[in-house]
């Protein structure tokens, strides 16, 4: 079988829009300071990566 284009991509849009979060809408908030609760959670996640 030939390669098929991914079903979840929307033709005509930027290719990156189909590849996970952090593209487009969410990008504006990328450099907002974290709340103390988020910072704590971030530390825990870092260890597991």
From Swiss-Prot:
Name the residues that span the membrane: none
Where do Polar residues bias regions lie? 8-20
The region called Disordered is annotated at 1-49
An annotated GO cellular component:
endospore-forming forespore
Q: Where in the cell is it found?
A: Spore core
Instruction: Please provide the record's keywords in A-Z order.
Output: Sporulation
Biological process (GO), any one: asexual sporulation
Spell out the Pfam families in the cross-references: SspO
Major localization class: other
Is Cell inner membrane among this UniProt entry's keywords?
A: no
Induction profile: Expressed only in the forespore compartment of sporulating cells.
Return the NCBIfam families for the record: spore_sspO
Identify its protein family. Answer: Belongs to the SspO family.
Q: What is this protein called?
A: Small, acid-soluble spore protein O
The species this protein was found in: Bacillus cereus (strain B4264)
The gene that this protein is the product of is sspO
